[in-house]
């Protein structure tokens, strides 16, 4: 006798269960790898790393100053541009994460001192008189 045909949701449940069992078995190994990579990659540079960092930065500066970018192939230029944009975008993402707000810093209304508010009102009054 043939097995009954499974419905859509039964197929989804079976697939989800199989994925869960596979991921559950792999989790300890993957978590250990993630922890090791995170510990290595997120560590600040050591004292021994600074000479290499300075040498690489000097290479970048000389590359820009001598116009070495003019001799790049289109493919190399696109790769360098993509890497630069990735670094810049991750900087801005890090800024958003750090300030916990997407559009800018949340500044409370009482952050500006009373003397500064008074000076601004005086300047606005002078600007209104000039117009």
Swiss-Prot record:
InterPro entries: ATP_synth_F0_gsu_mt. One of its GO terms (cellular component) is mitochondrion. It is found in: Mitochondrion membrane. The keyword Mitochondrion applies. Belongs to the ATPase g subunit family. Mitochondrial membrane ATP synthase (F(1)F(0) ATP synthase or Complex V) produces ATP from ADP in the presence of a proton gradient across the membrane which is generated by electron transport complexes of the respiratory chain. F-type ATPases consist of two structural domains, F(1) - containing the extramembraneous catalytic core, and F(0) - containing the membrane proton channel, linked together by a central stalk and a peripheral stalk. During catalysis, ATP synthesis in the catalytic domain of F(1) is coupled via a rotary mechanism of the central stalk subunits to proton translocation. Subunit of the F-type ATPase which has 2 components, CF(1) - the catalytic core - and CF(0) - the membrane proton channel. This is Probable ATP synthase subunit g 2, mitochondrial.
